[in-house]
Every structure is written in C-alpha cells, then in structure tokens.
Amino acid sequence: QKGTGIDNPLATLRFSVSQIGLHALLHDNSGKVHYIEPESKESDVYKVFDRGYYGTQKIGLDCFTESSSTLDLEEVSSKISNRAVTNDVNLFEDSKLRTFRLALSCTGEYANLFKGNGTEVQQKANVLAEMTKAINRVNEIYERDLGIRLVFVDNMDDVIYLDASTDPWGGEYNTKTAGTLDEVIGVNNYDIGHNFNTSDGGSAGCIGCVCKQASQSSSHKGRGYTGLPDATGDPFYIDYVCHEMGHQFGAYHTMNKCDRGNQFTGSEVEPGSGSSI
C-alpha cells in the first residue's frame, strides 16, 4: 500500500502489513527516508529510524553482470535529440505506469533467515512477507524514477525453497534460476525473474532482457540474482536488488572508481559508487 502527504504531496508513504508486522517507509521532499519496523521478530515494539541507522560500513557485494557490448553514449544522445524512436531506444513520455510480472525465487539458505517456525505453509508465508518488504522498497524507487511497477506472479510459493539441501541451486544461479522459473512458474507466465540467496554477489545475467525468452541463452529474462549473508534492509533492497534488476531493465554501470569491475565503457560518468539505479 502507498500514500501521499496531505499537506505535502511530495511526501510519500509505502507500507506492508503481514504476520511479521508493519513495515513502512516515509520519503520526504528533502530526499530523506524514514523507516518504521518491529524492534525484533517477536516484538510489539516498533522503532523509527533513517538510513544512517545502517551505518557507513561497506558491504562486500560484487556485481558479476557483464556487457556483451559497449554503450555508445553519443549515439544514444543523438537519437534522443532527434526524437528518434527505434527498436533499441524508446522514449516513454505518455506518463503511464507499466506493470511487470516478477517471479522471485529463493534458496534454502535465504529462506532460513526469515522462515521462523510453524508449518511449511506458515514458513513460506514468512519468507514471502520478507520478499514483499524488499519489492515494496524497490517499487518505491522504480515507480518514481522509471514508471515501472513489479507485481508477484501467482504460485510464487512454489519457488520459495525452505531446505538448502534440496533446492535447485548449488553455487550457479543465472542459468539455474531461469530454468527453474521456466519449469515451475511457466516461461509465458512472468516478465522478469530473479533469485534471492545469501552469496556475496549479484548478477542480472544480462542487460536489457526483461520479457525475453531467448531459449535459455544469456539474454533470458529469468537469469537475475542477488545475495548477501544478511539479505535484508536497504543495504540489500536498494544498493543491490535495485542495482541488479536495473541491469535486467537495460541499465549499465554508471560508477567510475579505481577498483570497479565489469567496466561498461562509455557509461561510467558518476564519481565513486555512483548514484543512479
């Protein structure tokens, strides 16, 4: 759910309510984000905090997304200046919100962080509630900046795996995620596929591959994944999930720093770690 400020329409609220409590974020017109979350999993006490709560410690996640070609910024700029609409550059100026069906899977290791106790159905519901928190946060950015909304596909419980010893993944995520989603969810039943895990890394498996089937090739729509040992909060949702899904929607790396990996020549124009999706 989401809301807009009565006195300040530039202020926005987005929240979810589930069996794990209320989780909300408030975005004011100064750019600050405030959060409301339970103090702990079993607590009725809530805390209000901002992004500074997470500290400034750098989390070691590597983006392994690779580019098959470089980005020609002069060519893109020329097409935009000339108002040219082609198959590879589309100008969306119709103010429409576009919805994409997201098939989001997870490994047993990820599920173990959030499943808690109870029956299998209850444990999957707990994991899905955490996934909802994540995508709710991603949508806050994507709807505002890109006009994109992600909605979960039906039967997503079928790709929430609770046991690491029996889930489909064994260290390789791109191809296995795409194959699992195609088989379990159905290749025609989702537009973008992703996996949450606890690895120290992420990869979209492609750039600009949303809605593409491509017979399990490197441009398949379901090859994305993101993982952190502590896969929760904005350091995971925004810094990494938004980043990897951004590749799937066609974004290249923008950060320009000495130790950057997987350089996309022509697009690294922002200092340090960058600020764009």
Name every feature range the model reports, one short phrase each.
Residues Q1-D44, R51, Y173:
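N-terminal prosegments of processed precursors
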Residues P9, S30, G108, D200, ...:
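Short loop/turn segments at secondary-structure transitions that flank enzyme active sites
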Residues R14-V17, L25-L26, F92-D94, E183-V187, ...:
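A general structural signal for short secondary-structure junctions and capping/turn motifs
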Residues G21-D28, D191-F196, G224-T226:
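Short, hydrophobic/proline-enriched secondary-structure or compact coil segments at domain edges
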Residues L22, F100, I192, Y237-I238, ...:
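Residue-level detector of short, conserved catalytic/binding motifs and their immediate flanks
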Residues E42-S218:
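Fold-level signature of zinc-dependent metallopeptidase catalytic domains
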Residues V153-T175, Q216-I277:
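The catalytic-center signature of Zn2+-dependent metalloproteases
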